[in-house]
Amino acid sequence: MEPEPEPGSVEVPAGRVLSASELRAARSRSQKLPQRSHGPKDFLPDGSEAQAERLRLCRQELWQLLAEERVERLGSLVAAEWKPEEGFVELTSPAGKFWQTMGYSEEGRQRLHPEEALYLLECGSIQLFYQDLPLSIQEAYQLLLTEDTLSFLQYQVFSHLKRLGYVVRRFQLSSVVSPYERQLNLDGYAQCLEDGSGKRKRSSSCRSVNKKPKVLQNSLPPVSLAASSSPACDQSSQYPEEKSQDSSPRQGSELPLQFLGSSEPCSDLAREDVGCDRESHKIENGAKGTPKLRWNFEQISFPNMASDSRHTFLPAPAPELLPANVIGRGTDAESWCQKLNQRREKLSRRDREQQAVVQQFREDVNADPEVRGCSSWQEYKELLQRRQTQKSQPRPPHLWGQSVTPLLDPDKADCPAAVLQHISVLQTTHLADGGYRLLEKSGGLQISFDVYQADAVATFRKNSPGKPYVRMCISGFDDPVPDLCSLKCLTYQSGDVPLIFALVDHGDISFYSFRDFTLPRDLGH
């Protein structure tokens, strides 16, 4: 049934400038919403004229509400043009307040995504043109929501979240930090390297680091690594000399770079010298004993850098201890010593009790005489390996010498929780485990939007948005339920940000999520 035209009503075509009479009529129309309740509900028609009149009035109010067009000032609208070939909307006039959280800049132009332009068109913030003709909201729905841009379900979720006040941005897979980068705390560093266009900035520190080896390579002469070896290792020290003589001049020029830039040659020299001292010690004594250290720490004087020290001048180091192009000089450390904080830390009673409890069960590594006898890091690792081997050797032969062995080693039975963990059949797993192997098996589902909280609108920056509050994956009510493979893939792509599934059922939107949980254990038995 078509609505009857009301006398005095004004029909205004979309995009046309109103005249004075039309503007007065648009301003004077009622702002009240239609009455939602008209008394008791009639379940069946009774054929009376009163019922037909009530039904006609309800339909007339509904048609008037749907046919009413929004009137906006032309000067407050931002002009924009839809470009279907590129798939974006380009602003032809300066943007408004919405530019703080929406849109992006590329090639010096301000652009909007289709969902952003359609939402702003419904809000009355922009005027959208296509082929120099203004578009109505119905035409914009038909042109902007296609298979190449985004679906109608995605726009429903986008507009719903925007009306709730959230900041919604398109999901970029390149912005997700890998678990390895999060383990190394590189997520903040990677965020600082990205500018507004999503490109990596050049780092000045990287250029300076690359320039330093060139200067060293040109200025440092080749140095033989066997020059400081002891006489007891003459036979072993001939190999570096023969290699340096047979090598090309290019390899000889790279030798100081390797010596200065890496600690491995230094550790190799120290290891060779320590080995030579060990061999000479074994030959002199004729028995295996504790190796003698090369350095006598009683004769080495370390500078006193305490705040109460009178002598704060540090003399220049010996020239033979420095590279050829480095000049050492003395330093007065008085200003630095005055900045030292000598005040004793004041702990509360609770902190002192906790510290005392922790110290009761803490073993001091330096108190171990065997550890103090190690002269290098390699000897300390060998000591730990030897102790681990001795600890795993004592096993009852009648239990471990047969085909059937116990479920776990006695050394691993430290507590009931460890025993239950080793003998459990179902191991604890997380939803994102193994997701890197399933990146191509998402099952058609994909993450659509990054959602930021509404209270972050005032401080939100598009070039540095920060960590999203949640990530949104959109599905229809008639679509199949995602399988475990798809859930693992999407959870891995989301990283450490919670993943929310938006389920759209004929305009009604419900939100679901999958979370990890740990099964309880009975440790009392």
Swiss-Prot record:
Gene3D superfamilies per the UniProt record, alphabetical: 3.40.1350.150
GO biological process per UniProt: mRNA processing; tRNA splicing, via endonucleolytic cleavage and ligation
Principal location: nucleus
UniProt keywords, alphabetically: Acetylation, mRNA processing, Nucleus, Phosphoprotein, tRNA processing
Region of interest (Disordered), ranges: 1-46, 220-273
Homology family: Belongs to the SEN54 family.
Chain's role: Non-catalytic subunit of the tRNA-splicing endonuclease complex, a complex responsible for identification and cleavage of the splice sites in pre-tRNA. It cleaves pre-tRNA at the 5' and 3' splice sites to release the intron. The products are an intron and two tRNA half-molecules bearing 2',3' cyclic phosphate and 5'-OH termini. There are no conserved sequences at the splice sites, but the intron is invariably located at the same site in the gene, placing the splice sites an invariant distance from the constant structural features of the tRNA body.
Name under which the protein is recorded: tRNA-splicing endonuclease subunit Sen54
Gene name of the encoded protein: Tsen54
